[in-house]
Swiss-Prot record:
Native organism: Homo sapiens
Identification of the protein by name: RanBP2-like and GRIP domain-containing protein 3
Note from the entry: One of the 8 copies of RANBP2 clustered close to the chromosome 2 centromere.
Domain GRIP: 1703-1753
A GO cellular-component term linked to this record: nuclear pore
Coiled coil regions, renumbered to chain: 176-229, 805-837
Keyword set includes Phosphoprotein: yes
Length: 1758
């Protein structure tokens, strides 16, 4: 409030007249003094304040006010004295201490008092810039003596505020004043990385002056040339930056002088150029910047000058921009350091962007403008004119860079729009997201035919911002997205363009550019728009000043409503229409289905907002305009009533396009047909042509062909309509989303297709359809096929779900190629099976590696020799726990090196290849067959077919490479060189592998005649060998004797997740039992974001041991709280999964510094904001006609048939080879693969909790697939020695490795130590061993130690993964013992049954006790998957009565456990064996063998009768039945089993009858176990066990040697889809034929009758259940304890919520009270204050005395 002197005198007189006493008058003096102070009557004010001080001398306010009056009179001494007295009376006045220090330093720095008050103020304001300036003044007065202290002061200040321009300049000046120029230059160079300093004109001026001084000093010394060149480089960069800032902020004269100085620097550097170095690259770039700034200066001169000749200036400016644009981009590799490279790259993009846009701007509307400029000014006279226009005529031209530069070689080259778009993206980074720069770029693109790439610009600035939000109705700042910012920029550019047009219409020359260069043009956006943009950038990049973020959030929140057109947005309808059209056009040009849906969806949003406004305009009503809108209204673009119909039509077209994008094709067609316009015709043509293409791709019937022709006719009709409308009205061409040429081209193509149909063209062959799989060609959608620009089309997918929309084309292509390749391979197999005279050809060093196409993998002929192209998966050496990621079982991509001559596809999965086992006859020792040595191949091998044929025939005749001959040397090193991996392998050579080039040279000799093909040379091998030779060690090369295993790619469980945060912390867990924090461990705390579903979780593992300490989701309801007593720790509560199950935990993380703790909190809250914006969208329903599924099914059937056919051929030929080699062969094994494809409806395991997928594999033993093209894959074979010669010379050893450990977790180690997995596509390589000479290995391997587990001589009747608990009586609650496989084991001898469970990994016993008849299982209350019982347990070594509980994941598994448990009690009484859980039943399943494979097999097989020897007959008669049924209504087909020798078994399997159970070989009762024979061979002590486990979706058997054991674990799966195969393989020296028969009838596997005594004992055991009543009571008590604990937690949570609510209410009351008190203070004494008295009395609960005082204050008496 201001008043005059007269008012003050009247008021003083009235108050003094009513005052009862002089003292009362004096007490009013303070108020009188304030009145005169406002009236600027300082003398009268001093008079009254002095009278007041005489009465109230202890009032600090009066002394402060008097000091202010003295300060205004510049009486510093008296002012300081008054301020000092006020501080003495009230020491809390911190600002007054700083004021005294400033006054003393200003008056006399040498005064000793100044230093005292400065130090006192420094303690009150640490880190204040004002304190620094005061200390700097004090040290400056000391001269040279204070330089060291001043240097320390500046350094400490820089540590706190590195961006402060004044401090940085002061440091450089201090260096310069002390002649430390090198340090000054180093400081300038270091500070160049700071963006805040680079944007300061004062700093850049300081840098230029410093570098110039340093260069002068270097020239005097002439010591270091490299230092001089580096400094010159920095000087040129500083000049360019200073020139840009000067043009923006200074006048024309200063800019001209600086440009002349820049010219001198370039001329000086030009004389020192030489070679390709950093200075040369920088000089070339600075030359471009020099000419660009020269052009900008010319236009700035026209902007500020009078009577300007715009034509002359614009032509000279165009010359400068042409030169700048044609300067090539610098060679970035010449620049040292990544920062320098990035800087120069950004500067180059900025130069090319600005110069290119200005060239287009200046030449717009002028024909051959650039050509005229080049012809006129690109010569000496034009150079002189340019020099005279820029510089003063006094300076000589020859000594300047501009006057001596050669400009005669420039071309007339207009910038390409694609290049400009790319340069713009790079320039965005150079300007750090400046709204002025973005608006300027948008204005340049606004006048061009193409759309600006605003989306790409914003992606450069805001990497992690989502593109669209699902919460358009909200205005929360956390929901801001890329589309909001893009809409904002479109609005700013739109309004700025209209404003420029209005200015240009008033006074504008034809040669004056519409938009001046960026450094010269005025501000293009309003202050409101700029402040909003800056606030958004500050919040997103987390650069808000503490305490200012709330204000920024309010600012952003207010304008988001406007951008999203919510509530009273006040937007002009024309702007809304502009937004809708631009977004629809941009969305149609994007390639991603999701991007199109979001852009066109936002366009529809704005159309819906503008349609009601159009109705208002149609009624000729006015639309209110806000007073201060975010986007200014321009009446020049107001929508007229005549335009409304057109806009409504555009809106409905956009609605229909969105329907098409979302897959609602029928709705889109209906909408388009209702709109009669060329746009709707074009979209209808696209839709019908797409339908025709879909049918043509799968056309199999005449009805579909006719439908395809109808669609093509409709397409033709709509295209003809477009052409007719365009001929009659040329204006409709502008509405077309594509050029007219695209319409004509598409019409021509459609006519050609119709002509082909009518004349029996490509789709017909001899009156019938061509083979769909071999001849069909996949057509791309017409939008991309016929549109000249990708921006003219949109994508939609009417037949597939959204997630397949983008991958459908590539998926179908891959399937067609697979089908074609499979058919060719089947035909080749038919041809090759009839050949028997081909020779086996072993690869030698002259055999080229490129004769086999990609995807073909040779067989492993030696034990454990893996293929070099095999995938890298888990093995026994590197086993990774799969507990945290279900992707563990997926196989990595095959590491195949493509070479020329390979197949057409760039990538073929390993499932397309197949391997053929090589018989052991192909590799023999010491057996000479001269006939084989004399033959040679007449034709070189050209492809894999020939190689395969020779391999098969060679094995059939029993011919192979022979060692032991002496005519020529044949070493293993040669073999290693000639093959492409370890061992002998057919496949591609890995050029990076040099493993066995020198191992075992001249160990064996061999004679091989003329088998090598002279046409195939080994040039590639020689090149590879030369690459590893060195000058000093050509003759010496050492190879390891035993190769290390290949490194396996470890699976951490964090695949597919992005690390948002990682920091080393110490984690604690609150133990409620002892009410204290317990340390969990040290490690890195990570915040991971799932890229698929957007969920965020927190994960921490201990150092070294990597045990999981924390693993839980981050939710929006979680709250971080500081740990009391520490500013470096945060605590929170979460449902943690680190121990396996969800468990509510209170966790705390302690950081090293408070800064790290604060950073964690910010990142945590940022993740919660990310979670708030996850779109809750459900995928669209699958609208599929089934064509893709049929094609996939057809391909899978063919592949399955191919594998069965190959297996049959391989086994048959192997058998023939064995019969012909009577003396040397033993039983060999073929290979087959049983593959059962999962149904399309088959889904993965159902989880109990939503959050349980963190440990999905931990308790899941079923592996299934829900995708047509995804299947679980197996791990790599176990790597062994290259040559395995440690087998016995007699006998045939067969070994098996389980394909999937069904009783344990996926991908765990089985008993033999091998890593197991599943693979339903890969072929199984069967290893074979033959009799021959025995060779001692060079380095013998250690003997295999048999691990004794204590479970020998026991059968596993039940095994499944579960969680085990023990009831703790002391604390009255259940405690977890561990997670692992719980087993029920029965001893073969005494039939005792026990429960055994070990923990995962550590294998510590959790349970080990007998099952007695008096034990009973009881369900725990609240869940039926938990069983509770009481037993005498020996897990800890001693007998102890325990109350135990086990929890299963699935209900059926829990029921199975109960059933087996009950059977175990009775089995012990009867002294009988229990039927294992795995052999109970088999689920009916589909045949894995395709019909095509059956047909091929029936055509190529022939019946063969084998003679069964006597022993075999006896054994075959006693085969044990194995349950394996297949219930099908049609012809049942089962893939042939392993080791099928002869056609009888095949005939049985492929008969029309229902499949019957079958067994393998000898199955005598003695020694057989669960259908598996373990009889010892006649002449050998070694035998091998085998167990084959087959799940419902996969079945695989792999060969693996193992030791003899008395029992074998029977693997099982949760869905009980298991087969048990019984086999017995007697080994003799003579050749033995094996035949597997299918018995017609077999007795049951287990049969037992109950005797009378057993029944009595069983009845008596039921009477003993009363003994367990106490146990049940204790369990009930334990359950109650758990419930009470949960109730306690709920109560504490309720109390916490109530406290939070009370705190919120209290905070609101305090805020209200503060507002009331402020209002009370500023109101005049009287009735207005009295009105607030009741409110204040009520809220403060004042006493009567206090109320009286407050009333007096309200009246103005006190």
């Amino acid at each position: 409030m201001s008043c005059s002197k007269a008012y003050g005198e009247r008021y003083v007189a009235s108050v003094q007249g009513s005052a009862p006493s002089p003292r009362k008058k004096s007490t009013r003096g303070f108020y009188f003094a304030k009145l005169y102070y406002e009236a600027k009557e300082y003398d009268l004010a001093k008079k009254y304040i002095c009278t007041y001080i005489n009465v109230r001398e202890m009032d600090p306010r009066a002394h402060r006010f008097l000091g202010l009056l003295y300060e205004l009179e510049e009486n510093t001494e008296k002012a300081v004295e008054c301020y000092r007295r006020s501080v003495e009376l009230n020491p809390t006045q911190k600002d007054l201490v700083l004021k005294i220090a400033e006054l003393l330093c200003k008056n006399d720095v040498t005064d000793g008092r100044a230093e005292y008050w400065v130090e006192r103020a420094a303690k009150l304001f640490p880190g204040s810039p004002a304190i620094y300036k005061l200390k700097e003044q004090l040290l400056d007065c000391e001269g040279e003596d204070g330089w060291n202290k001043l240097f320390d002061l500046i350094q400490s200040e820089l540590y706190v505020r590195p961006d402060d321009v004044h401090v940085n300049i002061r440091l450089v000046e201090l260096y310069r004043s002390t002649k430390r120029l090198k340090d000054a230059v180093a400081r300038c160079h270091e500070a160049e990385r700071n963006i805040a300093l680079r944007s300061s004109l004062e700093w850049n001026s300081c840098v230029v002056q410093t570098l110039k001084e340093y260069l002068e000093s270097l020239q005097c010394l002439e010591s270091d040339k490299s230092d001089w060149r580096a400094t010159n480089t920095d000087l040129l960069l500083a000049y360019a930056n200073l020139m840009l800032l000067t043009l923006s902020t200074r006048d024309v004269q200063e800019s001209r002088e600086l440009l002349e100085s820049f010219d001198s620097a370039l001329q000086s550097a030009k004389s020192s150029l030489g070679g390709n170095d950093e200075l040369s690259a920088t000089f070339l770039e600075m030359k471009g910047h020099f000419y660009m700034h020269a052009g900008s200066l010319l236009l700035k001169m026209g902007q500020h000058g009078n009577n300007v000749q715009w034509r002359a200036l614009s032509e000279l400016a165009a010359l400068c921009y042409l030169i700048a644009f044609q300067v090539p981009r610098p060679k970035i590799k010449l620049i040292k350091g990544e920062a320098g490279q990035n800087l120069l790259e950004m500067m180059a993009c900025d130069r090319l962007s600005q110069s290119g846009h200005m060239l287009l701007n200046l030449s717009r509307g002028k024909q051959d403008f650039l050509k005229v400029v080049v012809e006129t000014f690109a010569n000496k006279s034009g150079q002189s004119a340019l020099y005279d226009a820029l510089f003063s005529s006094q300076s000589p031209k020859d000594t300047s860079f501009l006057g001596s530069d050669d400009i005669g070689n420039i071309d007339v080259q207009e910038p390409e729009l694609e290049d400009l778009a790319r340069y713009d993206v790079g320039a965005i980074r150079a300007h750090n997201g400046s709204l002025q720069h973005l608006t300027w770029l948008g204005l340049q693109w606004n006048s061009l035919p193409a759309l600006p790439g605003i989306r790409k610009w914003l992606k450069q600035l805001f990497h992690h911002l989502p593109q669209e939000t699902s919460r358009l109705e909200t205005n929360a700042p956390e929901s801001i997205c890329i589309l909001d910012l893009e809409v904002f920029l479109l609005g700013v550019v739109y309004t700025s363009h209209l404003q420029l047009k209005e200015k240009c219409n008033s006074h504008h020359s034809s040669y004056q550019p519409l938009c001046l260069p960026l450094p010269v043009c005025k501000q293009l956006c309003t202050e409101r728009q700029k402040s909003w943009w800056d606030a958004v950038c500050t919040l997103i990049h987390r650069k808000a000043v503490p305490g200012n973020s709330a204000k920024l959030r309010l600012l952003v929140q207010h304008e988001i409503n406007t951008l999203r057109a919510q509530e009273k947005h006040g937007l002009q309808p024309a702007l809304l229409v502009h937004w809708a059209k631009c977004l629809q056009k941009m969305g149609s040009g994007l390639n991603s289905f999701y991007d199109q849906r979001e852009y066109i969806g936002r366009s529809v949003h704005y159309w819906k907002k503008v349609l009601p406004l159009l109705k208002i305009i149609k009624k000729k009503n006015s639309i209110p305009e806000p007073i201060d809108p975010l986007f200014k209204h321009f009446h020049s673009v107001d929508i007229q009533a005549s335009e409304i119909v057109e806009y409504e039509e555009d809106a409905h077209v956009t609605f229909a396009i969105l329907d098409a994008v979302n897959g609602n094709i029928e709705d889109a067609m209906t909408a388009f047909e209702s709109i009669k316009s060329v746009v709707s015709y074009w979209n209808l043509a696209l839709i019908f042509h797409r339908k025709a293409e879909d049918i043509a791709n799968d056309a199999l019937s005449p009805e579909e062909q006719e439908e395809c022709k109808n669609y093509l006719r409709k397409t033709r009709g709509y295209l003809i309509k477009i052409l007719d409308d365009s001929d009659s009205n040329l204006s409709v061409v502008k509405k077309l989303p594509v050029p007219l040429e695209s319409v004509k081209e598409m019409l021509k193509s459609v006519m050609q297709e119709l002509e082909n149909y009518s004349e029996g063209g490509p789709l017909y062959k001899n009156g019938s359809l061509r083979n769909a799989d071999s001849e069909i060609k996949h057509s791309t959608p017409s939008p991309t096929k016929y549109s000249l620009s990708p921006s003219k089309s949109y994508k939609y997918s009417p037949k597939t779900p959204p997630r397949w929309a983008e991958d459908q084309n590539s998926l179908l292509k891959m399937i067609r190629q697979e089908v074609k390749a499979i058919k060719e391979e089947m035909q080749e197999l038919k041809l090759n099976s009839s050949k028997s005279a081909s020779h086996h050809r072993w690869p030698t060093e002259n055999y080229g590696p490129d004769s086999v196409p990609d995807g073909y993998q040779g067989s492993q002929t030696f034990h454990g020799a893996p293929l070099t192209v095999a995938t890298t998966g888990p093995s026994v050496y590197y086993s990774q726990s799969p507990a945290y990621n279900s992707q563990y079982l997926l196989r990595p991509a095959a590491n195949v090196t493509p070479t020329k001559g390979s197949s057409n596809t760039e990538f073929k999965s390993t499932k397309e290849g197949f391997s053929i086992p090589v018989s052991a006859d192909g590799f023999k020792f010491g057996i000479s067959e001269p006939g084989n040595q004399e033959k040679k191949s007449e034709k070189p091998l050209e492809n894999d077919t020939g190689l395969q044929a020779q391999d098969i025939s060679g094995r059939k005749k029993g011919r192979g490479v022979i060692f032991g001959q002496t005519s020529s040397t044949f070493t293993f090193a040669d073999v290693a060189k000639s093959t492409s991996g370890e061992g002998f392998q057919f496949g591609k050579k890995d050029l990076n592998f040099k493993g066995f080039s020198g191992a075992g040279e001249k160990l064996f000799s061999s004679q091989y005649g003329k088998m090598a093909n002279k046409a195939n040379t080994s040039g590639d091998f020689e090149k590879d060998d030369d690459a590893y030779k060195t000058e000093d060690s050509d003759d010496i090369h050492f190879e390891p004797v035993v190769q290390m295993p290949e490194k396996v790619e470890l699976v951490t469980g964090e695949e597919g997740e992005k690390v948002l945060y990682s920091q080393g912390v110490k984690l604690f867990r609150f133990d409620a039992e002892v009410s204290q924090w317990k340390e969990r461990g040290l490690g890195n705390l990570k915040i991971l974001k799932n890229e698929v579903n957007g969920k965020v979780r927190m994960l921490m593992q201990r150092e070294q041991v990597l045990k999981v300490c924390a693993n839980h989701w981050i939710t929006t309801t979680m709250n971080l709280k500081p740990l009391s007593g520490s500013d470096r720790a945060w605590m929170w509560s979460a449902s943690d999964f680190s121990d396996g199950d969800a468990k509510l935990e209170r966790l705390a993380a302690k950081f090293k510094t408070p800064e790290l703790a604060e950073e964690f909190k910010q990142k945590f809250e940022e993740c919660q904001r990310l979670l708030l914006d996850i779109p809750l969208q459900t995928p669209h329903k699958l609208v599929d006609t089934g064509r893709a599924a049929k094609l996939i099914q057809r391909a899978e059937e063919m592949k399955s048939g191919l594998k069965d056919f190959k297996t049959f051929l391989t086994n048959d030929q192997t058998k023939v080879a064995e019969e012909e080699n009577k003396g040397s062969g033993t039983g060999a094994a073929g290979a087959s693969d049983t593959t059962i494809k999962p149904n399309a409806e088959n889904t993965g395991p159902t989880l109990e909790w939503d959050n349980y997928d963190l440990r999905e594999d931990a308790l899941d033993d079923s592996v299934s697939s829900s995708s047509v093209h995804a299947s679980p894959l197996a791990s790599s074979p176990v790597r062994k020695n290259l040559f395995h010669f440690d087998e016995s010379t007699t006998g045939s050893n067969f070994s098996f490795k389980s394909a999937l450990s069904l009783s344990k977790s996926p991908a765990k180690l089985n008993q033999s130590g091998t890593s197991v997995g599943t693979d339903e596509e890969s072929d199984v390589t069967q290893e074979e061993e033959r009799d021959g000479q025995y060779f001692e290995p060079v380095v013998p391997l250690p003997d295999l130690v048999e691990v004794s587990s204590g479970e020998e001589n026991e059968q596993v009747v039940f095994s499944h993964r579960a969680e085990f608990y023990r009831y703790d009586k002391d604390v009255g609650q259940w405690k977890e013992r561990g997670i692992g496989d719980i087993k029920i084991l029965q001893n073969y001898d005494n039939k005792h049954v026990r429960i055994l469970m070990r923990r995962d990994q550590v294998l510590k016993l959790c349970a080990n006790h007998r099952i007695t008849p008096d034990m009973s299982l009881q369900n725990m209350k609240g869940t039926e998957r938990v069983w509770v019982w009481t037993a005498c347990d020996f897990a800890d070594g001693e007998r102890k009565v325990e109350h135990l509980a086990v929890r299963f994941k699935l209900q059926d598994v829990a029921d199975s456990f109960k059933k087996i448990f009950d059977e175990a009690k009775t089995a012990q009484e009867k002294d009988s064996l229990i039927t294992p859980h795995v052999s109970r039943s088999s689920t009916p399943r589909e045949s894995p063998c395709g019909k095509i494979a059956v047909a091929v097999l029936e055509e190529t097989t022939r019946e063969r009768t084998d003679v069964i020897q006597g022993d075999d007959v006896a054994d075959a008669a006693s085969e044990v039945e194995v349950s394996s049924t297949s219930e099908t209504t049609t012809k049942a087909v089962v893939s042939p089993p392993k080791f099928v020798f002869g056609s009888e078994s095949v005939k049985r399997i492929f008969s029309s009858e229902k499949s019957k159970p079958f067994a393998f070989g000898n199955s005598s009762a003695t020694g057989s176990l669960f259908g598996f024979s373990f009889n010892a061979p006649l002449k050998s002590n070694n035998s091998e066990t085998s167990s084959v486990a087959q799940s419902g979706s996969e079945s695989k058997v792999e060969p693996k040697k193992c030791e003899l054991s008395k029992n074998s674990d029977i693997e099982q799966s949760s869905d009980s889809k298991v087969k048990n195969l019984s086999a017995s393989f007697p080994t003799e020296e003579s050749s033995i034929n094996y035949t597997f028969k299918t018995p017609e009838k077999e007795p049951p596997l287990w049969y037992a009758e109950f005797t009378k005594e057993e029944l009595v004992q069983k009845l008596s055991s039921t009477t003993k259940s009363a003994d367990h009543l106490n146990g049940l009571l204790r369990e009930i008590e334990a359950t109650n304890a758990v419930l009470m604990e949960q109730i306690k937690l709920l109560k504490s949570e309720i109390r916490r919520l109530e406290r939070n609510q009370e705190q919120e209410v209290s905070a609101a009351n305090v805020e209200h009270l503060k507002n009331v008190l402020l209002q009370f203070i500023f109101l005049k004494p009287g009735s207005e204050r009295e009105r607030l008295l009741p409110v204040i009395n009520t809220m403060l609960q004042l006493s009567l005395e206090e109320k009286g005082k407050l009333a007096a204050v309200a009246q103005g008496e006190e």
